[in-house]
């Protein structure tokens, strides 16, 4: 039994061929790890060098072996140093999946289509910060660039969540970067989906967060912000921009901010937070969850 397993391992690690003059030679397979879904992940990030010819021959025998093994999705992670190998993989049927600064990920679905491989990142996460001071005024900015440049529109500080960053932390960071205001996260008021918003393909999810200001003296970020100030909430809501056709979503968000400033609206508070996970729920249930955290889950059914 053990001998059979070892023989199978050797067969799948390399293939033996004969040269034109009859001499035998072996071509090793690309080193890959099986994933949870019956596929194989080939990580070449630690490979210092590989010629196109060597990669071509190894990929040929690897694809044959993977098909014989009944593998499904094949993933190849190529570092930028081996970018010359991309064309070879594409010609054999691989497609681009995603790329980062230091690598490109290629995929190949071996069974009959359709492929069930997940797409790359489908959404971008943005935040808008509704920041109130002790006088009930809100923090607003005008931008140096982007869609709102030269439109004379006052808007809340906005930005994009960084990789590995929580929504609440991103809101606090953006406010600090753009206005130098220290603020404390209160709750998520609402969120909006905008399809085909990123490169005319990806969806943008925009979270509106309420923050409470802890400092009040504004120092704008010169590189991105044209102007910043504290403004009465009603004045912000009544800007002509919010009443223009096509801007209904912006008007709804502005009205949510107005209702929240009058304490007639509640959103989602941060109930638990760890290094990798954050849970938000309605204010009405937050205290209940904290009170019953140690109870059996069946006791929460009411």
Curated annotation (Swiss-Prot):
Domain Nudix hydrolase, first and last residues per copy: 122-254
Gene Ontology MF term list: hydrolase activity; metal ion binding
Pfam families in the cross-refs: NUDIX (PF00293), Nudix_hydro (PF18290)
Enzyme Commission number(s): 3.6.1.-
One GO term describing the cellular component: cytosol
Tissues where this protein is expressed: Expressed in roots, stems and leaves.
InterPro entries: NUDIX_hydrolase-like_dom_sf, Nudix_hydrolase6-like, NUDIX_hydrolase_CS, NUDIX_hydrolase_dom, Pre-Nudix
Keywords: Hydrolase, Magnesium, Manganese, Metal-binding
UniProt entry tagged with the keyword Metal-binding: yes
Cysteines engaged in disulfide bonds, as pairs: none
Record-listed Mg(2+) binding positions: 174, 178
UniProt motif (Nudix box) ranges: 159-180
Cofactor(s) in the UniProt record: Mg(2+); Mn(2+)
Chain's role: Probably mediates the hydrolysis of some nucleoside diphosphate derivatives.
Family: Belongs to the Nudix hydrolase family.
Protein name: Nudix hydrolase 5
The organism of origin for this protein: Arabidopsis thaliana
